[in-house]
Amino acid sequence: MLSKFRRIVVVVLLLSCAVLNAQNRAKTVDAGGHAWWQHAVFYEVYPRSFADSNNDGVGDMNGIASKLDYLKDLGVDAIWITPCFPSPQVDFGYDVSNYEDIDPMYGTLADFENLAREAKKRGIHIILDFVPNHTSDQHPWFLDSKSSRTSAHRDWYIWRDGKVPGQPPNNWTSTFGGSAWKFDPATNQYYYHYFYAQQPDLNWRNPAVEKTMFDITRWWYKRGVSGFRLDAVDILFEDPNLKDNPVTGGRNAYGDAYQEHKYNTKLPEVHQALRGLRKVADEYNAVLIGETWTKDIAELNLYYGKGNNELQLPMDFLFTTVNKLSPAEFRKQIAAINSASGWPTFVISNHDIARSYDRYGDGQHNDDIAKLMASLYLTLRGTPILYYGEELGMKTTVPTRREDVKDPIGRSGWPKEKGRDGERTPMQWDESVNAGFSKTTPWLPVPPSAKTHNVADESKDPNSILSFYKKLLKLRHTNKELLDGNYLPLNQSDQKVLSYLRVYQDQAVLVALNMSGTPQRVNFELKRNGFASARALAATGKSSSQGDFVTLDPYGVFIGQLER
């Protein structure tokens, strides 16, 4: 209900002024005081799986370039490309062997530069996935580092003697199973690897490492990159005394005892490194997105930095912790996100998280629920990051046999851990044998859902998920209330309908989302609060507004402009 609207609108106006004043501190802003990335819609591209231009079964730079018009038409402002640097591909590019080139499987540096130029012509920014914590064990730095204890790059990595002969320096475990220490018999020391043994951690306490990594970002900025998504930024530093982590009981999928990662994650020194990376980014009006797995908003706030001088967009995964349609849970998460000290970010799926189509779907109304979830995270204040194929309703397709698994996590953790292949399948461009992704067998199988959920077919259907995404993104780009308006929750005891206002100056947009499988009719008391009606901006099915009431289909959406 809107009974408190008149009193609240004054407070909202004051808050709007405060928010705009804070935003005006941004180095380069638009007329409304916003940096380019604040109003942008980001789109994550997994390059192996997006578009294959040379028909080798693997996506590439030229494939991405060929789909720029599609992305522009969708409403995308920035593309985040997951790792594309040269790599042995032990962990699909998160093991980098050269930070200043493109992996041949994806094309050449010239291909990338062409992509950046073509994207710029369309007003699309390019964001690269940058892995600052570790390299490949095939990187020239590490090959030199392990060559002798006195090599020039020895201190670029973390080498230590064993606690006693035959035992690693401490009890730290790798996130992918087993000890986080690998013994090198040639130099009789262990090196540290938070991830796989083929991904040795860099020593960020070494000033030469820090300077080199800063310089690498400059190298890419000069080639047209508008920012970086920083992988695993919370683990850049480790306790120099290598204290054992507390053991918490129980065992993970790899059989290791669970630990509290007290001494090898989230150390305070991380923030100094982030401030350095941000200083370089500001020279180029670039954005830094951070992979920050935080337990709550208070911890997330640390990564914005004092005075917002670290990450502009620390990734908030709070929505991914709500895997059911619960108005109460989403109200709680939205309130937490809106209390953050910096600009919010919204993510509901990515290359490490099962697709939202399956996580929230009930098996019967999945298409409607996909539209509902889009309506939620695209009508909130902040920067949304879409995962490729979300706009189609792509499904998570989990392998059923170990021999079909490509992801090393799935191969080593099977059957308890089946890996991430399911959310990395080829983009579904049409209903052909390989979904228009390639003319040869793709690196991962195309899901059966490509027959019904693909770009070609959905582009022709005005009621498709894709058509609804296009409508929402167009609305988001043009509606000031959705871009900058404050959030005002409504009917907070309603267990079936999540509803709220986005209020900007004296204008308001009503968002009503039915998170139940039964029709709902909600009285918002519009006339009592000085409004004649709610004019539909976007709605699903037969969801509509009449007088004070909004009627919603099962899992229905109504987004309306309040009119006086």
Task: Identify the role of each PLM range.
Residues M1-V9:
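Bacterial N-terminal signal peptides that target proteins for export
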Residues E525-T540:
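Solvent-exposed beta-hairpin/edge-strand motifs
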Residues W37, N241, N245-Y263, H271-A281, ...:
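Loop/helix patches that line or flank the sugar-binding groove of alpha-linked glycan CAZymes
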Residues Q23-R218, K222, I235-K295, M427:
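Acidic/aromatic-lined carbohydrate-recognition and catalytic surfaces
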Residues S136-K146, I289-N323, M394-K406:
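Substrate-binding cleft/loops of secretory-pathway carbohydrate-active enzymes
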Residues L143-N188, V322-S339, G410-P447:
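Core domains of carbohydrate- and sulfate-ester-processing enzymes
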Residues Q546-R564:
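C-terminal beta-strand-rich structural cap/linker in extracellular carbohydrate-active enzymes
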Residues V9-A18:
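Bacterial N-terminal signal peptides
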